[in-house]
Structures are given as structure tokens and as C-alpha cells.
Amino acid sequence: MNIENYVIETASLAKSAARKMSIVSTVTKNNALNAMADALIENTNAIIEANKKDMENGREKGLTESLLDRLLLDEARIKSMAQGLRDVASLEDPIGEVIRMWRRPNNLKIGQIRVPLGVIGIIYEARPNVTVDAAALCVKSGNAVILRGGSEAINSNTTVARIISEAATKAGLPEGAINLIENPSRDAVNVMMKLNDYIDVLIPRGGAGLINAVVKNATVPVIQTGVGNCHVFVDASADLEMAANIVINAKTQRPAVCNAMESLLVHKDIADKFLPYLAEKLKPLNVEIKGCIRTQSLVEGATEATEEDWAKEYLDFKFASKVVDSLDEALDHIYKYSTKHSEVIVTNNYENSQRFLAEVDAAAVYVNASSRFTDGSEFGFGAEIGISTQKLHARGPMGLKELTSSKYIIYGEGQIR
């Protein structure tokens, strides 16, 4: 079977399953999610063996340590994935929720209720945990899902997807509710992007290249998830220790994720104290700093930041640093270079915090907290399908409700117009 026919056959199966998924009971969905969790734990060794192949291939291809970290599945991460499934099972089912209801003067009763989107296509890169997170949220929100992971994780994804799909079907979900495109070629993605008759929405998760390619070439509607050029602005009134802790966490806890800090802005009135203090704390972590002239004069070993650096998502132990003269300059810089993902101000000035919240255009805007909290589980949504940086149909961490649409139901007594 050629690639086009294979993808269309998979999409057709998903479309058939989506019709049935829309009316699957909450109990059945929860049973399926718990069965999927059990199956992951029971098959831990098989998953780790498959992942070892991907890790070996990744090292041979020269993947960075941060990307290899995203690819890794070990016993602890598999347990975390299983717990994520159970957490989603414990969340309230959004399907059938009455959003609003009212009565018209002609006595028509009109209600708006939450319904699934239908078939969701997820295109993602070297993070096999996305296979589980995406499947969990799609199942709970009554959608069928077509997963297409990156070639780097093909062995891990194939093993995990087969395990959870079989468990879900045995627990009562329709066949085709969870699907993985096992062909890692780009041709498969190109076919997916054109399947308007089968796929209701595409959600790309990955780097700028992947996301831009899907947005540019897809005819299926796309929810654009975030490339994260996230900034931390350390205001003149900031507490030095708090600011340093936030920067270190935002940059180094997991540098290869989209909510990690990539650019640091420091008010000139605090720069001569803060930047050397921060640099000393960063030394054991081997973080590379690229900076403006003033940053270079204050931080030993800092190299020159180019125009490209201000817009770069490093996904590594690197960041760009600029000393700014004012809050206005910080806001202008963020406006110019932000990808509208997550932006942070560290300040003890209430007026400045409120200006920052009001004027920064991003999915998540923080006062005195790390950008690393832009995450579905941290927001209390359970797992997330991605972090949307657009304004239609959803924005920010996308949990269950963001994977639904609505329809109107109308009760009449024979009314005609």
C-alpha cells in the first residue's frame, strides 16, 4: 500500500470512530484511560527496549543532550505517563456540558452544549510522552486522534501507541479511536495536511520549522502551538535572589521545552548588581550567555548577541541578555521579538507589574514566577495537547475544553417562522 492510501485508510478509520466516540459514556472513557495506564506499567520493559533503539539512533545522528533528554523514556517517566492518564480520568468530562440556556419570547428554549471536535491530527517531534498525553485528552474529550510523531521516536511511539490503543479498545472504545501513522516520512505528513474530509483540526507540536511548515501548507484547519521565545524582565525594584531563582529555573530546569526562558532583559539600575550575581550562580550549570555591550561588560565570558539571537529559541543551555533603560524599552523589545508564548516580569513595583500584564501580548503573562508554569498540569487542566500561541480557537495550554466545540439545541412546541 502506498503512503497516501495508508494515511487515508487510517484517517477513514478515525472518522468512523469519531462518530462513535461522541456518544461514549464518561464511565467507559475513564475505564479506558485507566486500562491504558495499567497497560503502560505492565509493558514498561518493552517500552524501554524500544526507546533504547531511538536513543542509540539519536546519538548516532548527533542529537544534542537536551533533545536526547526529551526523547528518553525510563521507568520514572513511564510511571509519570501512566499517572497522567489516571489524572485525566479523574477530570470532569466536558462533553454534554450546558454552556448556557435561555428562553425566547416565542417560547423556544435554546441551549448551547459542549461537543467533541471530531478527528484531531497531532504532528509532533521527538517527545514520545506526547503520544500518551495527546491520546488521553482526545479520549476524554470524545475525539478520535491520529498521531504522527517524529522519526527520532518512531520505535518508542509505535510501541506505546499499540499498547494504549489495544488497551482502549478492550475497555470499550471503538476501533480507530487512537491511531498512529507508523510511516515516519514527510510524505505522510503532507497527506495528513490535506485531508479536510477526514480530519477536523491539526495541532503541530515542535520547533519553528515544523509548525511553520504545517501552518503554511495545511488545508485542514490548524491550531498553532508555540515556539517559545520567552522573556524574563528583571525590573529595577526586583528582589535579586527571587529574580535569580526565577531565571535559573526558567532556563535550566528543562531548557529544551517551549516555556523555557530564551531572553533576559535587565533594567539598567539593577544590572551592575544583578548580572554578576546571576552569572556566579549560573557557573556550575555551564550556561552560555550572549549579550549586549553592557551585558558583556558585566558578565565575564559573555559573547556578543546578534540580531538573530534576540529572536532565537535556543532550546539549550544558552540565552540572550540585554540591559534596558526602562520598562518602556523592555516592552518594546518583547513586542518586537516575542512569539507570544510566555513572558515574565520580576518586580516589586505594583504599577509596573500592572502595565506589564496589560501591555504584553502573550498567551501567559507572569508577575514574579517562572515561565515554566505554562503547562496544562500546572494550570490544573491535567495533561495538555499543546500550548496555543494564536487567538483562535484556543490560547495558552490546551486542556479538555479546548478540544471541544459547541452546538445549539433548540426545544420547540411547533413554532414556525
Curated annotation (Swiss-Prot):
Its EC number is 1.2.1.41. The gene is proA. Pfam families: Aldedh. GO terms for cellular component: cytoplasm. Keywords: Amino-acid biosynthesis, Cytoplasm, NADP, Oxidoreductase, Proline biosynthesis. One of its GO terms (molecular function) is glutamate-5-semialdehyde dehydrogenase activity. One of its GO terms (biological process) is L-proline biosynthetic process. This is Gamma-glutamyl phosphate reductase. It is found in: Cytoplasm. The keyword Ribosomal protein does not apply. Belongs to the gamma-glutamyl phosphate reductase family. It comes from Clostridium novyi (strain NT). It is an enzyme of class 1 (oxidoreductase). Pathway: Amino-acid biosynthesis; L-proline biosynthesis; L-glutamate 5-semialdehyde from L-glutamate: step 2/2. InterPro entries: Ald_DH/histidinol_DH, Ald_DH_C, Ald_DH_N, Aldehyde_DH_dom, G-glutamylP_reductase_CS, Glu-5-SA_DH, GPR_dom. It catalyses: L-glutamate 5-semialdehyde + phosphate + NADP(+) = L-glutamyl 5-phosphate + NADPH + H(+). Catalyzes the NADPH-dependent reduction of L-glutamate 5-phosphate into L-glutamate 5-semialdehyde and phosphate. The product spontaneously undergoes cyclization to form 1-pyrroline-5-carboxylate.
